[in-house]
Amino acid sequence: MQNWFRLLRELFFQTKGQEARVTILRIFIMPTNYTNNSLNQEFCKFLAEPMFVIICKLIFLSIILICSLVGNVLIITVVSLRQELRKTLNFFIVNMAVSDLIIPLVSIPFSLAGIATNSLQWPIRGLPGLISCKISQFLKPASLTVSVQSLLWIALDRFVAVVLPLKANLISSRFRAFAIASTWVVAVLINSTDLYTTKLVEVGGNFYCIKENSILRNSFGYGRVVLLTIAPLLLVTILYFAIAVTLRRQNKTLRCTAVKEHSQRKTKAIRMSLCIIVTFNLCTLVYTILTIASLQSEAPNLSCFVNNVLWFLALLGMYLCSVVNPFICFTFVKSYRRGVREIFTGRNYGGGREDLENNKHGS
């Protein structure tokens, strides 16, 4: 069986033409509804890579794993320790940090194992292997879904604070708890199809964690692109446009220095949240484009080298999302930086009136 497995793989890479490769892979894996593009993508994963490329990938992912784990744990710890940071904006940032921890704790370790062994073989067999296979494929998009929703709530919170300041009490602690819980419930519902379409397949005595390209998965795939990329981007753009117009009007009419400073602090909080949203969309851009392309029945027939580079960049971008958010928070907010110093030095640096006022408006 292993010789047959090796023969099919060698035959694939010696065969030219998309249709021939599709036929071989259908025999090679299982009778599923793969599109031509996704079939070619699956076989490209079996192409052995040079040792230099493997080492570079391992280094990049290891750095991201450490930075993501440390950064997000610090965000959660600092907000829990510092009273002035317990505001709506920061609670949504903590929610993102919790979802981002899925990346270094679940996603990256499996990626590192696959790259280190230069193999797609799933390291766990039997029922535990099937469960870990399904959960690992489910948690990655679920983490992304929670982050997207958190960004929407952050934008809505900033919109209420600036455009509807008299309605700020609408976002109460109870409503905030409901909003945070809803991000996880929606993430489970939207990505539940991955639990069904992900299979642990035995080929040649080896096990592979593979997603079926069924009609169900493709239909939900298009739906997820709309719900998690296009719709949120449009909504966030509208909200921040309204915020920008309101701030511009306020700056023209403000006379009192104290009121101007109050407006400037709001603007700083807006810039931080906007920076988080922009970097998130940039990090997930390549992944979104490739996801849409993989759902198409006809797509450019890329070489395996180009295909593997693009998908690694997409994966790298997704993983970087879990690193940039803590970096932005520590850059924009003094209270976050003070909290980190307190953790490592054991000293209480306190917080000035300026920090209290800044965080009163969500920064």
Regions found by a protein language model. Name each.
Residues 57-60, 64, 96, 176-183, ...:
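Hydrophobic alpha-helical transmembrane segments of polytopic
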Residues 282, 288-292, 309-359:
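Seventh transmembrane helix
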Residues 1-70:
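Extracellular N-terminal segment of 7TM GPCRs
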Residues 37-47, 117-142, 176, 189-231, ...:
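Loop architecture of class A 7-transmembrane GPCRs
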Residues 50-62, 89-153, 168:
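Extracellular TM2-ECL1-early TM3 structural module of rhodopsin-like
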Residues 102, 106-107, 113-119, 139-153, ...:
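Fourth transmembrane helix
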Residues 90, 94-97, 144, 177-181, ...:
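Internal alpha-helical transmembrane segments of multi-pass membrane proteins, especially GPCRs
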Residues 99, 245-287:
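Intracellular effector-coupling site of seven-transmembrane GPCRs
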